[in-house]
Amino acid sequence: MVADLTKGILKWKSRIEFDAVGSSSYYEELKGLPPLASHKKLTQAAIFNSTKYELLQVKKDILSIYEVVSRDIDEERNQMQQIELQLKKSLKKVEHSYKNVLKQRASTNCINGNDRLLANAEKKIGSLNEELACVNDIVSDIVNNLTALNANLPKKAQLLKDDSINVAHYPLLFDFLHKSCPKSIIATSEASIHENASPSPLLEHDELPAESINSFYGENELQSDSLAPLQTHDDNISSCKKILPPKFNTTSGPSIETNFENISADGLTYTKCSLKNSISLT
């Protein structure tokens, strides 16, 4: 039986045909592959030595990235600190304002606080009204005194006229007088009518030399300085009218200086007599 089995196997082997590897294409491709490296080159040290420059570059890149990131973090930290300081200052201001508002609300929240504020406002308004009334009284007194003094002067010597040079010198005063008491301002037409209606007595007499005038004024001044007894007001006016200053036909521009060209005879005599009366009263 064993002999029969061996015979059968041999017959089967004789029938099978094997293909050789050397004649296949795969074997040719296997031959084309490079040979394996040595085991010394496959160690860890050999592998890291071959990539040493790449490792150094990666290390440098990591360090530079770390520096940039750390710098950005420091800047952000500084900015956060500054913002925190500003927020603290703002918080202090807000707390201070809040405390002030609380105080104001506590002082004005109740009825007594509002009444106190109203009373203070009424006191201030009352004091302002009193001061305004005092100012109005003072101004009215000044205007009354000014108009009274102007009315006592002769018509030619009066200062409150529309055509007077004082209008240019004191525009605010004349504007105020026009608004407050327009009757105190003498119009130009009214003044001319009054002058034509009452001519000056100086035109009825002849002219006198200047020496007599100077001697007359010099004697009067000496008498006033020595405080001699004077006559009454009517006698003084009559005695002054007896000696009259000459007429001057020359004209000149407007002037504020007192001279014989811009002072009328009536105003001059009236002023002299008024001075004498004031000296006699004192």
Curated annotation (Swiss-Prot):
The keyword Transport applies. Residues 64-140 form a coiled coil. The keyword Coiled coil applies. It is found in: Cytoplasmic vesicle; Cytoplasm; Vacuole. Its main location: cytoplasm. GO terms for biological process: endosome organization; regulation of protein localization. Signal peptide: none annotated. Component of the biogenesis of lysosome-related organelles complex-1 (BLOC-1) composed of at least BLI1, BLS1, CNL1, KXD1, SNN1 and VAB2. Interacts with VAC8. Component of the biogenesis of lysosome-related organelles complex-1 (BLOC-1) involved in endosomal cargo sorting. Belongs to the VAB2 family. This is Biogenesis of lysosome-related organelles complex 1 subunit VAB2.
